[in-house]
């Protein structure tokens, strides 16, 4: 996956362009001396140092941009690295199969699990097929169908959240978007199996929460979780999307802020420069956290899980 640099990464992009140019010349001209190779090494060291410096002080808006990065790994990317024997299950058994929600049975270290998550799509045709990761009611009903199946067979549920929000189209509203989300919130609160939810990119509003009522809620370091997008908030409060950076800061959408407010349990570190820089390393960190969470939840009986989940939900809105 090639690196796409965001605006605030431009100084890094400039150095990487020089490295690419020198490397290209070096591969063509085999007579290049040691000084030439040393210059490439110096630039690589400088790029790493500059990346560390920039990423040590990211604003909430810059983190929002990283959460939306076009090369950021999506749920199905992680499935390849973390799970085996993935068997996708389709349809809500009522209306249609919403491709914005992907789910099915899989194994993590030979243990059966039900995995469910948003899928945005990468190329234009796939983005349209996946509706840019914005589920309609049938997507949430499919997710609930799979959760109830997992509950019936005592299989833990792992959800992966990455959506701008639930689809706000007329058809979705006519088919009961708000009802589907509300039903998921209610039903997830009473499932008798462990639920681990991880925000891997954007966690947008009710569209995220509809598969995010977990016993453990994690966030990748450069993911976001909010009731509305920074642009939406800025449009309402300041009547201008130009104020999105200010809105992002005010809403506290980043993992560190949400951990401080006790709305999430863990922050999963990302490779230097973001998850897209090294998907394998990111997947290994995510897998480690999932296994840790499952082992902790395994120690609880059914009633303890339900009580813990209920108490967690009731604390929302309190510092």
Curated annotation (Swiss-Prot):
The keyword Phosphoprotein does not apply. One of its GO terms (molecular function) is ATP binding. Its main location: cytoplasm. It is an enzyme of class 2 (transferase). Pathway: Lipid metabolism; malonyl-CoA biosynthesis; malonyl-CoA from acetyl-CoA: step 1/1. It holds the Pfam family ACCA. GO terms for biological process: fatty acid biosynthetic process; malonyl-CoA biosynthetic process. Gene3D superfamilies: 2-enoyl-CoA Hydratase, Chain A, domain 1 (3.90.226.10). Component of the acetyl coenzyme A carboxylase (ACC) complex. First, biotin carboxylase catalyzes the carboxylation of biotin on its carrier protein (BCCP) and then the CO(2) group is transferred by the carboxyltransferase to acetyl-CoA to form malonyl-CoA. This is Acetyl-coenzyme A carboxylase carboxyl transferase subunit alpha. The gene is accA.
């Amino acid at each position: 996956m090639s690196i796409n640099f965001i605006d605030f990464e431009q100084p890094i992009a400039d150095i990487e362009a020089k490295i690419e140019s020198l490397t290209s010349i070096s591969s063509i001209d085999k007579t290049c001396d040691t000084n030439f190779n040393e210059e490439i090494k110096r630039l690589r060291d400088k790029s790493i140092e500059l990346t560390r410096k920039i990423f040590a002080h990211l604003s909430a808006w810059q983190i929002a941009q990283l959460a939306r990065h076009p090369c950021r790994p999506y749920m199905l990317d992680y499935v390849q690295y973390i799970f085996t024997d993935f068997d996708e299950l389709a349809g809500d058994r009522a209306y249609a199969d919403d491709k914005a929600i992907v789910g099915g049975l899989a194994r993590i270290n030979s243990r059966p699990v039900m995995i469910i998550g948003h899928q945005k799509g990468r190329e234009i045709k796939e983005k349209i097929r996946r509706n840019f990761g914005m589920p309609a009611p049938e997507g949430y009903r499919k997710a609930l169908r799979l959760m109830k199946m997992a509950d019936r067979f005592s299989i833990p549920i792992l959800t992966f959240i990455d959506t701008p929000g639930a689809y706000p189209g007329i058809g979705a509203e006519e088919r009961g978007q708000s009802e589907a989300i509300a039903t998921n919130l209610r039903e997830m609160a009473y499932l008798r199996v462990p639920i681990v939810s991880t925000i891997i990119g954007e966690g947008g509003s009710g569209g995220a929460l509809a598969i995010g009522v977990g016993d453990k809620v994690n966030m990748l370091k450069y993911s976001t979780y909010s009731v509305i997008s920074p642009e939406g908030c800025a449009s309402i409060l300041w009547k201008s999307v130009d104020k999105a950076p200010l809105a992002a800061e005010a809403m506290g959408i980043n993992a560190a802020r949400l951990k401080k407010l006790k709305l999430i349990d863990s922050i999963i570190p990302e490779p230097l420069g973001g998850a897209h820089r090294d998907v394998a390393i990111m997947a290994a960190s995510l897998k480690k956290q999932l296994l840790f969470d499952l082992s902790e939840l395994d120690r609880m009986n059914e009633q303890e899980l339900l009580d813990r989940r209920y108490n967690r939900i009731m604390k929302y809105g309190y510092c």
